[in-house]
A protein has these predicted regions:
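Helix-to-loop junction immediately C-terminal to a conserved catalytic motif
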Residues: 49
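The feature captures the beta-strand-to-loop junction immediately N-terminal to the Walker
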Residues: 34-36
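H-loop/switch region of ABC-family ATPase nucleotide-binding domains
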Residues: 186-187
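A short, flexible loop at the N-terminus of ABC-type nucleotide-binding domains that lies
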Residues: 1-4, 8-20
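Conserved ABC transporter NBD signature motif
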Residues: 57-71
Length: 236
């Protein structure tokens, strides 16, 4: 599915942000990526999505170079902000995004997904009238409706209500059941413990080897304690 090999990247005077990072996201698996702020998580995601130019290493998606049209239409990136065009209705936004991915949105299916997330009929209103949480839900609804081979979730659940949080957990697992893959970048360890198959830690620009989430929970009681231990081990 997604293969990242020996990727290094820096921002001029700031020096290297990523140092020989490698990561594999298999088909029908959910991988959680954690790490402190500034560790390079968003930089890595931007490289995968070709927002930043790759200078060293390689990234392939579905066996294709990440810059190819085939690779790009296989990835759905749901970011941490709520930047969605306020001049469109929810339906217009979803249907436009679907066309960009080469699929046709079904109005009734979109309506059902919005209703599932407590937004009955909202899809026909301008996004300008949406609250922050509603905009986040709209972004997530797009991911659940488009069924891309790989969905990257980058702190997207911040700001949604608890009912929507549980619905997202359910939808993530359904996506995996359909053979789709996910990369979830989050500080929400409860979310990662409920949904992910593997966890990787990105710290100081270096990626840890993936560990099964279940083994972390069984061995440490949860991701938080495992992270604390790993942090102490890394201190000089």
């Amino acid at each position: 599915m997604l293969d990242i090999r020996d990727v290094s990247f820096g921002y001029g005077r700031r020096g290297e942000v990523l140092r020989s990072v490698s990561l594999h996201v298999p088909q029908a698996r959910i991988v959680g990526m954690i790490g402190p702020n500034g560790s390079g998580k968003t930089t890595l995601i931007n490289l995968v999505c070709d927002v930043l130019d790759l200078r060293e290493g390689s990234i392939t998606m579905l066996g294709r170079k990440h810059t190819s049209a085939e690779a790009k239409t296989g990835i759905m990136h749901v970011g941490g902000n709520d930047d969605v065009p306020s001049c469109l209705t929810g339906w217009e936004y979803v249907s436009t995004l679907a066309r960009l991915y080469g699929v046709r949105a079904d109005r009734s299916e979109v309506g059902r997904m919005f209703a599932l997330f407590g937004m009955q009929g909202v899809q026909d209103r301008l996004i300008d009238s949406y609250s922050h949480g509603m905009r986040k839900k709209t972004q997530l609804c797009c991911a659940f409706l488009l069924h891309c081979p790989l969905t990257i979730v980058d702190e997207t659940l911040n700001g949604i209500d608890i009912d929507a949080w549980y619905l997202c957990v359910e939808q993530f697992l359904r996506m995996r059941g359909r053979g789709l893959s996910m990369l979830i970048c989050s500080h929400d360890f409860a979310l990662l413990e409920r949904t992910t198959d593997q966890i990787v830690l990105l710290r100081n620009g270096r990626m840890s080897a993936p560990l099964p989430t279940r083994s972390i929970i069984d061995g440490y009681g949860g991701i938080a304690e495992w992270y604390r231990v790993r942090t102490l081990e890394a201190e000089p």
